[in-house]
From Swiss-Prot:
GO terms for cellular component: plasma membrane. Residues 465-467 are annotated as: Interacts with target acceptor peptide in protein substrate. Residues 1-5, 89-91, 143-147, 191-219, 274-275, 325-327, 369-408 are cytoplasmic. The keyword Chloroplast does not apply. This is Dolichyl-phosphooligosaccharide-protein glycotransferase 1. Belongs to the STT3 family. Its main location: membrane. A motif (DXD motif 1) lies at residues 34-36. Oligosaccharyl transferase (OST) that catalyzes the initial transfer of a defined glycan (a GalNAc-linked heptasaccharide composed of 4 Hex, 3 dHex and a sulfate for A.fulgidus AglB-S) from the lipid carrier dolichol-monophosphate to an asparagine residue within an Asn-X-Ser/Thr consensus motif in nascent polypeptide chains, the first step in protein N-glycosylation. Changing residue 531 to R/E/D: Significantly reduces catalytic activity. A motif (WWDYG motif) lies at residues 465-469. InterPro entries: AglB-like_core (IPR054479), Oligo_trans_STT3 (IPR003674), STT3_N (IPR048307). It comes from Archaeoglobus fulgidus (strain ATCC 49558 / DSM 4304 / JCM 9628 / NBRC 100126 / VC-16).
């Protein structure tokens, strides 16, 4: 069968699984997947309609506001169609861009696999496994207008170019530069590629890789910590190329060099050097040394079962087994390092799935060979045939044996193994009908604010838990106390866990709160699906030492309970103004 047809089938599969929730997204408007997407669109709306990208926003962390520090590339990409054709075009483009990037990433996996093994069947299997991996789907699903899809695409493009010969290695620095302009954490993925390159390449190739890292170091002009990090990685690789020259005399020279480099980083971490505080910040980020990170689902550590499920279930197990047979040190190094990252924070499974797909595809290929479905053997024979410039009759006869039914059986085998992946990859839309109605009501019924001017402090704010902050900001066009950036989260947590109305109203006055929004999932209404323990943790309570019964008893004495469960009937300064199923809106009165 024509490999182009099979690749097209993989692409169509990747599109299909990523087009979930189409009806929810285009439901009487345009909605997005997740939470962070909404703040990106808030920035894009200001950029398109007001012709500037704000570096400060009074509509979050009200009334203090918050500085916008992350790189702007992704926002400018989303805003570009709007600058030409109006904001509505950016709204639509933002819905489909992650899917486009996801499909391109699938193609890059295929090309990378070809670069590593030079076998089309192996490459197609790699692409299919990556296309089905739950975490790869979640990051590139329809409406997921967040920077992750772009970062992963650029990471894959960098890896692919590094694996090519000659000057292509230097060009790998270009996608790394774009990655640096899209995510402040880009040096983490740059380091992952650098360590993998050091282990895999010889000294000559390593010098080209080192040169490529000077390109993203240019980002120093806009983001000095990022630029310095990439320059440090370039130096690390250049010195590594020198060390490689001594491997004939000192067998483990590279290993000692890596150990020495890690020790140097640790020294920088523990010694208070003002100019290198970003190193400490980066390490703390990786290890999740932050009060907020343990309360974020994707930032949890040591989630081994979730790592397995997010990376492909049985396919991830295949990857672990394949480590015993696979010989490409670039892929093996990337797998082990990204696995360590994923153990530190679950979010890094987005990069772990890359080597995992390649490794599992290799084991699947070996199994197919044992079942007399030619994969590597067929490629070898075809190569010999091309060299002889004539078709060997035996090869031709063997190729003819691989008919449609054989391909169909193999495809069915791969799909059956991928069923758990597909089931997990399809997730309910975050924004329920109750929330859509509540957000639209707030947009049209509450006092209007000058939403498009983030530099002007509005008259009031809306208190909610941080998960809903960006929804309220973008859809309802109202200022919020806290959103997914965690600023304001402590006050929000203390407000909801307050044991007296007086305590809650003091926080409300401090934060200029006029309305409060609650939902079932932040209460203890369903103990198996609740955000309340996370709220308690942010408020300063040690939830780990409490039983479920103690947490429930604590909840029953909070202002959140008296608001959401009792509809504020026994409160003086709050009254229920509107209810939309699971979502309730209260007004602060007499404050």
């Amino acid at each position: 069968m024509d490999r182009k047809v099979l690749m097209l089938a993989v692409i169509l599969f990747a599109l299909a699984v990523r087009f979930q929730n189409f009806g929810e997204i285009f439901d009487s408007g345009i909605y997005y997947t997740g939470y962070d997407s909404y703040y990106h669109m808030r920035l894009v709306e200001v950029m398109v309609k007001e012709s500037f990208r704000p570096d400060y926003d009074y509509y979050i962390n009200y009334p203090f506001g918050l500085k916008i520090t992350w790189p702007p590339l992704f926002d400018y990409i989303l805003a570009f169609p709007g600058m030409l054709f109006g904001f509505h075009s950016s709204e639509i483009f933002a819905v489909f861009l992650p899917v486009i990037l996801g499909v391109l990433s699938v193609v890059l996996i295929c090309l990378t696999a070809l670069q590593i093994v030079n076998n089309q069947t192996f490459a197609l299997i790699s692409a299919f496994i990556y296309a089905a991996a739950p975490v790869a789907v979640w990051k590139t699903v329809l409406g997921q207008a967040d920077h992750h899809a772009l970062v992963i695409f650029l990471f894959l493009l960098s890896a692919y170019l590094l694996l090519k010969d000659g000057v292509w290695k230097i060009l790998a620095g270009l996608p790394m530069l774009f990655m640096a302009l899209a995510w402040l954490g880009s040096p983490i993925y740059g380091a992952l590629l650098a360590f993998s390159a050091l282990v895999h390449f010889d000294r000559k190739a390593l010098r080209l890789v080192a040169a490529s890292y000077l390109i993203p170091a240019i980002s120093f002009v806009l983001y000095p910590p990022v630029g310095i990090s990439f320059f440090g990685l370039a130096a690390f690789l250049f010195v590594g190329s020198v060390v490689k020259g001594y491997e004939d005399r000192f067998r483990n020279a590279t290993i000692y060099y890596i150990a020495l480099s890690l020790a140097t980083v640790l020294i920088i971490y523990f010694i208070p050097l003002p100019h290198f505080e970003f190193v400490k910040g980066g390490i703390n980020y990786i290890f999740g040394a932050n009060i907020y990170l343990p309360t974020i689902s994707e930032a949890r550590s040591l989630q081994i079962f979730e790592i397995i499920s997010a990376s492909g279930y049985i396919y991830f197990i295949f990857a672990l087994i394949s480590v015993l047979f696979f010989r490409n040190r670039f892929v093996l190094s990337m797998f082990f390092l990204s696995f360590i990252l994923a153990l530190m924070q679950l979010r890094f499974t987005e990069v772990l799935v890359v080597p995992s797909a390649l490794l599992s595809a290799y084991l699947v290929s070996l199994v197919l060979e044992r079942l007399e479905y030619p994969v590597f053997e067929k490629a070898d024979e075809e190569e010999k045939s091309r060299r002889r410039k004539r078709k060997d009759r035996k090869v031709k006869q063997k190729n003819a044996e691989v008919e449609w039914k054989d391909h169909a059986v193999v495809a069915a085998f791969l799909v059956i193994l991928a069923i758990p992946c597909i089931v997990v990859a399809v997730v309910p839309f975050d924004l329920t009908e109750d929330w859509k109605e509540a957000l639209e009501w707030m947009r049209t019924s509450l006092e209007e604010q000058n939403y498009l001017n983030p530099y002007e402090k509005p008259e009031y704010s809306v208190m909610s838990w941080w998960d809903y902050g960006n929804w309220i900001l973008y859809v309802s066009k109202k200022a919020v106390v806290c959103n997914n950036f965690q600023a304001g989260a402590v006050d929000a947590a203390k407000f909801f866990t307050a044991k007296s109305e007086d305590e809650a109203i003091k926080i409300a006055k401090k934060r200029g709160v006029r309305y409060v929004v609650t939902a079932d999932e932040i209460t203890m209404k369903d103990a198996n699906n609740t955000k309340f323990p996370a709220i308690m943790r942010i408020a300063g309570y040690n939830v780990d030492l409490m039983t479920e019964g103690e947490i429930l008893n604590f909840f029953n004495h909070t202002v959140l309970y008296r608001l959401h469960m009792e509809n504020a009937e026994n409160l003086t300064h709050f009254r229920l103004v509107k209810e939309f199923g699971d979502v309730k809106i209260f007004e602060v009165v007499g404050s």
